[in-house]
Amino acid sequence: EILRAKFPYIYVDEYQDTNPIQTFILERIREKETIVGVIGDRAQSIYSFQGAMPTLFDSFHVDANCEFTIEENHRSTKKIISLLNAVRSDIMQKGVDSTIEGENIVLVIGDRNDAFRMAYDCCGGVLQSLSRDNTTANALKKDFEETSMNTKLLNKFEESDSDDYRRQRIWSFIQAVELSFNNNYKEALKKIEWIFSNENNSRKAAIASLSKLLLYYKDFCNKMLIDFYHTICSITGLKLTGFREGNAKKFYDSTPYKSLAICVDIVDDTSSHITIHKAKGAEYDNVIVFNDELKSFLLSPNLQTNEEHRIIYVALSRARKRLFLYLED
C-alpha cells in the first residue's frame, strides 16, 4: 500500500532479467492503482543462475493496445542487423535513416590468441573481446595459450589441497594480486584483510603485504604455484603448512601461477577482455565473440529454450560497426 501511494507509475527496464520474487512483488503492486510498465527482450534472458526465466517475461500480461514492439535498431550496421534477424523469428529488426551498410561479419578460425590479434589489427587497435567465462577472458588478457587453460582448475585446486587454512589464503592472495593489476585496489584489500584480523591494524598489514607482493610479481608470475607459496611465506611472515609427498605437493609443483590467476573473477572489469554477462547493456564499435557453442548457434539457433544461444545473441548485439566470430576449427 505504501509503494502504491508513493509510486503511481513504475517503469522496469530489462524485465527479462527479473527473478520470481521480483516478479511476484511487481504483480502484487499492479493489482490496483499503480500502473506498471516494463520493457525487455526475452531473447536476452541470460540470468537463470539468479532465477530469471523467459517465461516470467511472457507471463506479464497487458491489453493488446498497451503492447508495443520496438523494431528499430539504432546501434548496429545493416550487416549485423541482418545476422540478428537471421537467428530469431519473433521480431524483424530494421535500421534507421543513419544506419550504414557496414563491413561483412568475419569468421576467424584457428588459434584463439592469433584470432584476436588478427581482428585487433583489422580494427586499428580498437576491439572488445566477449567470452563465455572468466577464465577465457582472463587468459586473453594475459595472452595465455589455449592449450594450457583449464576452466575446472579451481575445483582441482580444492580437491588437491585439503588444507583449508593454506588453500584459502593462497587463493585470497592470488585474487588480491590480480585485482590490483586491474586497478581494483579496494576489492583487492578486501580479499586479504581478513587474513590479518589478529593484527592491531589489519588494513595496514594487508596494504604492506600486497605492496610487497606486487613488487615481486615478476619473480613468481611465470613460475609454479609453489614459488608463489614461498613468496607469500617470505614476504608476509604467515606460517602456512609445508608439503609432504602427495596430491597437494604435486598440484603446487606442476600448476603455473598464471593458470590459477586467470580464474579470478574481476567484477568491475573495464578491460578489452570481459565476459558476455558483464557486457550486458553496453555497446562497442568492434567485437569479437568467443563461445564454444557458437557453431551450434550458427547452424541451428534456438533462442526460445537454449540459454547458451541467448548468451551468444547478447554478445552479437553489442557490436556497432564490426563483428568477428571465433571458431576453433
Regions found by a protein language model. Give the residues of each.
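The feature marks helicase ATPase cores and/or their adjacent C-terminal helical subdomains
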Residues: 1-329
